[in-house]
Amino acid sequence: MTLFFAALTPFVGAALVALVSRLGRSHSAWAAGAVTLATLLWLAPSAHLPFDDTLLIQQHDWMPGLGLNLAFRLDGLSLLFAGLILGIGLLIVLYARYYLSERDSMGRFYSCLMLFMGSMLGIVLSENLIQLLVFWELTSLSSFLLISYWQHREEARQGARMALAVTGLGGFALLGGFLLLGHIVGSYELSDVFASGDLIRSHPLYVPTLVLILLGVFTKSAQFPFHFWLPHAMAAPTPLS
């Protein structure tokens, strides 16, 4: 299995859960758990990877005319976060199976959860800045769906709208910062960005680039002073919040 398929697996899992949800609640949980566990087990043999080494970089044609490829990397740091995403995700799958009531749609919950896990996994495995941004925007969308899961509750609808508005606006700032960063470096590949520290810091656009990226990251991760949407997001089901 390549990194491309590893990143794609949770999205396939989201579709699979939706298909088997008609067979019963347990089938949805088993499908979500099996896909998550399979991806986690695939990453397990690389657990010895040092933090300063890159094990694998894979590229697939995406928009070659624009110089953009689907590019994935696996190093010690991305492996750590991928393990956290999948490990905690597996616990959420188990917890939610016994937490949600008979009236709750198990298939919809697990499909949205798999979409969220896939989006986060795509972020930590991305080698391309634009691709990373696409996955990060998918976390905003899937967060909206999860926070508004109990859509009959006003606080859930309000929390979902607030989260989407704040993180969506932050996405525009992040896009601007990434475009400037790509302009400075001449590439959107993270490997090139990491190797161009001196060039970036000495460039006249360094400060606006840094400010835009920080604005995007702070809004999406609910850092002060953009943390106000996070308490409202707790309207999501407890296994998520």
Descriptions of predicted regions:
Residues 1-241:
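...captures the hydrophobic TM-helix bundle architecture rather than a specific catalytic motif
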